[in-house]
Amino acid sequence: MACLSRIFLILMITMSSSSPPFCSGGSRKELRDKEITSKSDDTQASYVLGSKFVDPTRVLQLSWLPRVFLYRGFLSEEECDHLISLRKETTEVYSVDADGKTQLDPVVAGIEEKVSAWTFLPGENGGSIKVRSYTSEKSGKKLDYFGEEPSSVLHESLLATVVLYLSNTTQGGELLFPNSEMKPKNSCLEGGNILRPVKGNAILFFTRLLNASLDGKSTHLRCPVVKGELLVATKLIYAKKQARIEESGECSDEDENCGRWAKLGECKKNPVYMIGSPDYYGTCRKSCNAC
């Protein structure tokens, strides 16, 4: 009887070892499928948002007075093309969701995170990314990246500027710092400017010294675009947090008297309080039609 029991036990062990491990195999297959799905999701996220990591080997310090830095290949080809597809002349690049609210485009959000990582400045201190196009300009003008003529008013809280090149140009469009220590490229007539527009490159320059005082050497100008088209995105970074109500789609007044004040002309008489400034979020933006 003991012999039969021993034989039965041997048969059971043999059958167990020869049977295909359905559960084990299924688990491995399920795990493998999860890994493939995870990799696919990571690839998709990487394509949508782009790389948020900063590669210090691509960064060159071009000047200390003022502080000017060049990042080669800051944006990918896809990111440049995406910004171009979203652009509206002199306006922020946003998208609108199903509810009609204005939201920051995911690719733009990724770019802004990378800008913050590169500059070591909080993202909340930055203004919206703006995209502009320049073609066939008069060579006698001194231009900048914030309009047709160089701005004569410097925001008191402006700390730094990031210029993102979205295209190459056949001729022109270089960025110059006439008062900087960079030599000798101080003229649009000189060739070989390292700050010439190259698609994907980014330039960071500070308008303040390390002690927070204004850097007079940060005065800059842009060479006119003689041939081709220049597409460029700019982002201003301030010393203080910037209110960007557009992200939530809200537009409201903070005082019940705003409507009456607006009718009395206070929007023009007292624009800082009513509409706002880089340092102050306006109290009556809705009544002043500022949003």
Swiss-Prot record:
Membrane-spanning parts: 157-173
Matching InterPro entries: P4HA-like, Pro_4_hyd_alph, ShKT_dom
Glycosylation sites: 211
Domain Fe2OG dioxygenase: 125-239
PROSITE patterns: SHKT
Keywords for the protein's UniProt record, in alphabetical order: Dioxygenase, Disulfide bond, Endoplasmic reticulum, Glycoprotein, Iron, Membrane, Metal-binding, Oxidoreductase, Signal-anchor, Transmembrane, Transmembrane helix
Listed name of the protein: Probable prolyl 4-hydroxylase 12
